[in-house]
Every structure is written in structure tokens, then in C-alpha cells.
Swiss-Prot record:
This is Queuine tRNA-ribosyltransferase. It comes from Streptococcus sanguinis (strain SK36). The active site is at residues 96, 270. HAMAP family: Q_tRNA_Tgt. The gene is tgt. Belongs to the queuine tRNA-ribosyltransferase family.
Amino acid sequence: MSTSPIQYRLIKKEKHTGARLGEIITPHGTFPTPMFMPVGTQATVKTQSPEELKQMGSGIILANTYHLWLRPGDELIARAGGLHTFMNWDQPILTDSGGFQVYSLADSRNITEEGVTFKNHLNGSKMFLSPEKAISIQNNLGSDIMMSFDECPQFYQPYDYVKKSIERTSRWAERGLKAHSRPHDQGLFGIVQGAGFEDLRRQSAQDLVSMDFPGYSIGGLAVGESHEEMNAVLDFTTPMLPENKPRYLMGVGAPDSLIDGVIRGVDMFDCVLPTRIARNGTCMTSEGRLVVKNAQFEEDFTPLDHDCDCYTCSNYTRAYIRHLLKADETFGIRLTSYHNLYFLVNLMKKVRQAIMDDNLLEFREDFIERYGYNKSSRNF
């Protein structure tokens, strides 16, 4: 799709793995890959300003179609001039399709060929989301990268169910492409599904690749399967996708999963993990997980991470951050959130350098050992 506003440029392949260094060109700028994308569910990354996100090196952020459709409404955002203007963010934005949120409402939804009926989680009213509506909402939001409406089956669903599901997702993808009213300034990605079944992943990938999307997402992972099962699916799925298009692994943010995804050829990742755990005082550091609210840090006047040069670690101590969190001060959450986001954005920067140096496997081994991962307990 040469007229697509989304272009992928391969810079270098790592010699020993499937990892690749590249960049993705969008209407609102170019960002390097592999890249971790902070999640701004309600058109804001929780507690962080756009200036802070730029400062830490976030080249692209994600916003949530489902939540913005319900509140404040996609038509209001369109009248504001689109999501970039509405939230004062002049760099790339990716929107999901809303599908994952709808499917997480398992007790109140009904799937048909036309779309999904579900209850609005805010007021209980009946709502309907179709492939066409999901595209229309995203066209109003004006994101640089959009997602096709898909069904996200549980990883351990029976084979026959998953087969019917991916075939419907392919039909929905085709309907979404036809409904896309802004193909010259918004790029629409297809989403490969298929749970853990290699032949169904292949069928899904072949269907979507034949439609010539400007990029492809790998969905249906990080939904309860083991780390090893996720890697196995990536091992056989990413080679099914075109080398000249971006590859996006949805909903993945644990540090080892990011590195292992890159090794298997993934370019883009997103997850709420860094900000969600930060609100409970859990921090990612170069030496593993640190729960700064714990009593042992009451008089610890050192940074969260001795090897981190982020704003938080350059200015504040564990003892001070612990005090803020124990006192329910919002500034404490701002500091832990900034640090965790910076940690993952900076991890991807280090990964990009390791690809350039052809030593990603050595980098992974050193990182895993320092972080304290072991087979009995991953501790993200």
C-alpha cells in the first residue's frame, strides 16, 4: 500500500536473532523501533504531562477507542480538532479498536456477525460496536495508527471456536478497510488472532496480509498464557508477516517479554503495566522489582534505581517517595509512574543499541540475571 501514511524503514537486522532496528514514519513524525508505547487510556498517560512523556523519549503513545467513545465522545474530540489537538500531543498516536475492552466485559456482551452488543460500564446502557463503527470512531479521533475491530478469544478456547472467531475477524477486517474514510492520513493495521494454534495463526495472517494493511498487530497474547507459550506463538507468527511492514505485539510490557518479543521480530509494544504497578508503589529497577512502600525503605536516602538517570532518580530518594505514597500524595504516584515509564522506554533504547552492536542475546542474558528473573517466579 504505497500511498499509506504509515511507512516502515528497516535500518538493520541483528545477526543472531530475528530482531530488527528500524523506524516508522507517520503524519505526526517518525519514531525509532523497537519502541514501547505508554498507554493514555483516557487521552492522558496517568499523572504524566505530554512534556514529561517527550522528555523521557516516548515517541508515540496509545489512546483507547472504547473509553473515549463513551466519554467525552469521539464527535466532540473531532470538533476539538482531533485527539492531537484535544490533548496537546503533536507526536504520533495509536488507537486500539475497542475490541479488547468489549471482550473483557464477558458477562454482558453478545457477539454476532454484525458486531458486539454490550453494556456500557459507566451507566449500564445497551451499546453496539461494529467493525464500521470502530473505524468511524477512530476516524473522528484522528490517530496516526488505527486498529481493525477484532475478536480476542481466550488463549485456551477450543480449536473450533477459535477457527470460527478468526474467520469472523478476517471478515470484520475487510469491512473495516471498506469503511475507512481517511486512508491517506491514518494507517489501519490488521490484527492476527488464533490463540495458540499455529495453523489458525497462519490462516489469520494469510487472510490479513492478502488485504495489504500498512502494518500488522499480533493479538490474543498476554491474556493468561505462560511466558513460554507466548514466545512459542511469536516464534511461528512473526515470520508469517511481511518484513516491510511494522509488527505490533499488543498488551505486553513486562521487561523480559519486551526483549523476547524483539528477539522474535516485533517492533512495537504497549501496556498499562508501568503506570498500574506504580500506583501501588511497585517500581522496575535494573536489579528487579522494588516495592518502595515497604518498611525497609523508610530511611533509605538513595534513588529508586542507582543505574537510572530519570527525573525521579536524579532528584528524589526512596524514603521521600515512600513517605508521599504512605501519605496518599499524588506526587508520589507521579514520581513512580515517571520512573517506570522511563525504565521501559530506556530499556528499548538499550535494546536498539544492542541490535546495532549485534549482541542482543548477551544483553538479554545480562539483563535477566541482574533483574532477578528465575523459572519459578518471573515478577515481571
